[in-house]
From Swiss-Prot:
<keyword id="KW-0443">Lipid metabolism</keyword>
<feature type="modified residue" description="Pyruvic acid (Ser); by autocatalysis">
    <location>
        <position position="198"/>
    </location>
</feature>
<comment type="pathway">
    <text>Phospholipid metabolism; phosphatidylethanolamine biosynthesis; phosphatidylethanolamine from CDP-diacylglycerol: step 2/2.</text>
</comment>
<keyword id="KW-1208">Phospholipid metabolism</keyword>
<protein>
    <recommendedName>
        <fullName>Phosphatidylserine decarboxylase proenzyme</fullName>
        <ecNumber>4.1.1.65</ecNumber>
    </recommendedName>
</protein>
<dbReference type="Pfam" id="PF02666">
    <property type="entry name" value="PS_Dcarbxylase"/>
</dbReference>
<keyword id="KW-0456">Lyase</keyword>
<keyword id="KW-0865">Zymogen</keyword>
<comment type="similarity">
    <text>Belongs to the phosphatidylserine decarboxylase family. PSD-A subfamily.</text>
</comment>
<comment type="subunit">
    <text>Heterodimer of a large membrane-associated beta subunit and a small pyruvoyl-containing alpha subunit.</text>
</comment>
<dbReference type="InterPro" id="IPR003817">
    <property type="entry name" value="PS_Dcarbxylase"/>
</dbReference>
<dbReference type="GO" id="GO:0005886">
    <property type="term" value="C:plasma membrane"/>
</dbReference>
<dbReference type="InterPro" id="IPR033175">
    <property type="entry name" value="PSD-A"/>
</dbReference>
<dbReference type="GO" id="GO:0004609">
    <property type="term" value="F:phosphatidylserine decarboxylase activity"/>
</dbReference>
<comment type="function">
    <text>Catalyzes the formation of phosphatidylethanolamine (PtdEtn) from phosphatidylserine (PtdSer).</text>
</comment>
<keyword id="KW-0594">Phospholipid biosynthesis</keyword>
<keyword id="KW-0210">Decarboxylase</keyword>
Length: 240
């Protein structure tokens, strides 16, 4: 048992002290590193400050592996962050999913979150739609309608549909989505990122209750947002 505990501790330390960097981040890391070298030629302390910023940039674009639950019917969080809003809202009109409200879970990502986004369920991408817009604070409810966004509609093998939306914010002004119409994806699969903090909304099928609460910290590719096959009602929670 002691040996297993030591091994688990070593794995945990490795996870936090070493992390892969997403390929989207390498150009930024390179620019920060070059800037640090140039600043160091001007004045040593400036070079050290640039080196710290380079390390921060590398950490920002970290892309750790995740252990994704594989049971059918689970809806997995597409983003790291905090549950900002939970409620009934109609999906974006560009997805052609009708005007009827669906349960929406909004996950806010700060500049300290991992910004790699992941698919919430297994299925087929039905439609991807980019919409330019404003860059309001992503924590505002109206950001879902007014801000730049990438909306994705997907269908499971049983025909039930889920939508998720990448929303730009005050700082985040670059949404990247690698998905294409007709593409087959798996839950937990990486599909894109939003640079420097923002929000991802998930729209559940009719009659499905959320299994997360407002203010809850969640992890992309690991935290279960909902269970499509469960009859459990919406979970309640409070900050303690």
């Amino acid at each position: 048992m002691r040996g297993e505990a030591v091994q688990a501790q070593q794995i945990s330390l490795t996870k936090y002290l070493w992390f892969p960097i997403n390929r989207e981040g390498w150009p930024f890391v390179g620019l920060f590193a070059l800037g640090a070298l140039l600043l160091g030629q001007i004045w040593g302390p400036l070079g050290w400050a640039g080196a710290l910023l380079t390390c921060w940039c590398a950490w920002f674009f970290r892309d750790p592996d995740r252990v994704t639950p594989t049971r059918d019917g689970l809806v997995i969080s597409p983003a790291d962050g905090v549950v900002q809003m939970v409620g009934m809202v109609a999906p974006p009109p560009e997805l052609d999913m009708g005007d009827a409200p669906r349960m929406r879970i909004s996950v806010f990502m700060s500049v300290f979150s991992v910004h790699i986004n992941r698919c919430p369920v297994d299925g087929t991408i039905v439609k991807c739609s980019y919409r330019p817009g404003k860059f309001l604070d992503a924590s505002l409810d109206k950001a879902s309608a007014d801000n730049e966004r990438m909306s994705v509609r997907m269908s499971r093998a049983d025909g039930r549909e889920i939508a998720f939306v990448q929303i730009a914010g005050l700082v985040a002004r670059r949404i990247k989505c690698d998905l294409k119409d007709g593409q087959q994806v798996r839950a937990g699969q990486r599909f894109g990122l939003i640079r420097f903090g923002s929000r991802v909304d998930v729209y559940l099928p009719d009659g499905v209750a959320p299994l997360v609460s407002l203010g809850q910290s969640i992890i992309a590719g690991e935290t279960v947002l909902a269970d499509l096959d469960s009859t459990e009602g919406a979970r309640q929670g409070e900050i303690r």
